[in-house]
Amino acid sequence: MSSDFKTASQEKVFEIMAPVGTVAFAKAELKQWMKPVDVVVPKAFRESGHTAKVYREPYGVTLVIGPFNGPLTLLFDPAVQVIAAGNPCILKLSEGLPATSKLLLDLVPKYFDPRAVTAVSGSREEVTELLKLPFDFIFFTGSVKVGKIVMEAAAKNLTPVLLELGGQNPAFVDPTANIPDAAKKIVWGATAWGGQWCTSPGYAYVHESVAEKFVEECKKAVVELYGTDPKKKFDDYSRIVSPKAVERLASLIDQKKVVAGGASDPQARYIDPTIIYPVTWDDPIMEDEIFGPLLPILTYKDFDAAIREVKKHPKPLSGFLFSRDQKAIDHFLASLSFGGGAINQVNIHLFIETMPFGGVGNSGIGHYYGKAGFDALTHAKSVLISPPDVAIEHLFPPYTNEKVQALSQWFEY
């Protein structure tokens, strides 16, 4: 991973220990997840001895397409869910990670029966051909643009999909927030993993009364986290996946608005943790998901108006609010649609197995993690069980008024 781009010590923990934790949780809970579930039937059915159960059955051969930004976590977490649900899977490795992909191509056949798990590599052409195959399920993690291509290809075979995409994720800071705490967490969230995580705060949206203080605390946080020369913090600060990606990020920076950082070195795949202020919705950096360690800071006067502004844009994968005001928290949760998120925290909801993870709208379709993932990757087969010697006579013609009246009781629970 280090030779591809992952370098921070904490990322090694998240990349390795997170999938291991997923395995342990699935092993502990799987028997319970697999059990048929009894469901209530209408009163008339109960009185005649009928019962009903929902059984879970695997969809079948599943294609898991992994992204570059989570070489292990975002490949093996879905794979664990797929396998736990009883589906054989094909792992499509990221072409952006040559060293990691080469290693996995060696290790997967060593430790897995190829009838259960197979790893393949390839670029766009190979993926295009792969998507023509009639898979039983496709699990894709990546960009909205490619997600639409995957969904279009899946539709030709009526293949169900789970799409984990992304978006420009807001981090609100209201006047009641603990400003130093909010600044440090948001700066970390925007720069951890080089900002190359789908759940990273895409921008801070700060009440104007605390904006200047927040900016100063963000500048302090950059130094506290990465020192005065982050480029030397090779163990604590990730590089970017490619020189081209660095150039794209650098083009988004308005140097006149940089209050911290701003430097880049494409050949070293490096860009500073960068704070940009003041930013407006018209700035180019706000047009799309940033996917890098840049933190634009916008200000608002009215919380309702700020939420309405966010709602004009595609639904984000994550949403964050820093506040001590419970009414503001309740309003945020009730008014803004997003995949998942946190209050007074960022990013780490991603690693909690008991919380279904997934997007909404442009940020994704479907959820995984824990029981939610097991359910998403299995078909719910509903079965009504009748005693062998019981007939519901009013079901059969000729239909008298008495039979029609009896049939109407089918809808009473």
Q: Whereabouts are the PLM-identified features?
A:
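Hydrophobic packing residues within well-ordered alpha-helices of enzyme cores
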Residues: 1, 101-104, 108, 130, ...
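N-terminal Rossmann-like NAD(P)+-binding subdomain of aldehyde/semialdehyde dehydrogenases
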Residues: 1-51
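Residue-level signal for inorganic ion chemistry
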Residues: 23, 86, 117, 138, ...
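Rossmann-like NAD(P) dinucleotide-binding subdomain of oxidoreductase/dehydrogenase enzymes
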Residues: 42-181, 300
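ALDH superfamily catalytic-core signature
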Residues: 112, 146-281, 343, 403-405, ...
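Short glycine-enriched loop/turn motifs at secondary-structure junctions
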Residues: 132, 165-166, 197-199, 233-234, ...
